[in-house]
Structure formats: C-alpha cells, structure tokens
Regions:
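Aromatic-flanked redox-active Cys/Sec active sites in thiol-based oxidoreductases
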Residues: 8-12
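Helix-turn-helix
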Residues: 41
Length: 143
C-alpha cells in the first residue's frame, strides 16, 4: 500500500486537527496516511512520494511559521517538481494571503497543487473545513 505523508506545523492545534482530517480522507480512500510534525519530517521520504500534504497556519503578517516550516518548505522547493501536493492551514485574521503565496511558490517550483489552492479555515476547523480536508486527502490518494 502506498503511503501519503501529511506534514504539518501547528501551535494552537487547529492545523493539527486539519492534518487529522486530511489523513482520514487518505485512509478512507484506501491508502496509508502518515501524519508527521515538521520537525520529524524527512525531505528524502517526501522525494520518494508521488503525492503528499503540507499544513501550516498563517503566522505574523500572513507568512509560514519561520522557525521550522519555512526552512523545511524552502529546502523542499528544490525537489517538488512533478509532485502533487495538498496544502492546508488555519488563520486567525487576514484573508489567506499566506496560502496564496505558498500555492504560488509550490507551483513555480513545478508541483501541482490539488485544486489549484489550499484548504484554509479561520480559527478551529468547523465541519465544512474538516470535510474539505477529508476531500483533499481523497484527492491525494487518487494520484
């Protein structure tokens, strides 16, 4: 059975809850999901996967978390060409600029972002956001 990694960073638990929902979608579609906090994630493992998910909330002035997730994404940019990636995350304020920027970065690096956009929600994911995350997982599993 092929595996789909769901790599995320979360401070409040909101993006972690979204990661759980993405993984549920993957397993509901018949594939194995591995949820990994970014500090334990391996770029080499992601290189061997056709599809994977990345999650991070908006931080500061709508940017990725700068201590762990941003350096990970920067390193990953060099090896995402030809990969299918699902992006997700929560925010407290703003309009989703951090996600649009992230989608653009991955697209320019040669990845296909599922649906052409990330799944976002304000604060804790409600039922609609959880459903959207599950659908993201199912789409990744279909790759």
């Amino acid at each position: 059975m092929s595996k789909i990694s769901v790599v995320y960073w979360s401070q409040s638990g909101n993006t972690a809850a979204m990661a759980e929902a993405v993984a549920k979608g993957v397993t509901d579609a018949g594939k194995e999901a591995e949820i990994v906090f970014v500090s334990s994630a391996s770029i080499d493992e992601l290189k061997s996967e056709t599809a994977f998910a990345l999650g991070c909330p908006a931080m500061g002035v709508e940017v990725l978390e700068e201590g762990e997730m941003e350096p990970f994404v920067t390193e990953l940019e060099g090896c995402v060409a030809g990969k299918t990636i699902g992006l997700f995350g929560s925010y407290g304020w703003g309009d989703g600029e951090w996600m649009r920027d992230w989608v653009d970065r991955m697209t320019v690096a040669g990845a296909t972002v599922v649906g052409g956009e990330g799944v976002i929600c304000q604060d804790a994911p409600d039922d609609d956001a959880k459903t959207a995350c599950e659908e993201l997982g199912k789409k990744l599993a279909a790759v």
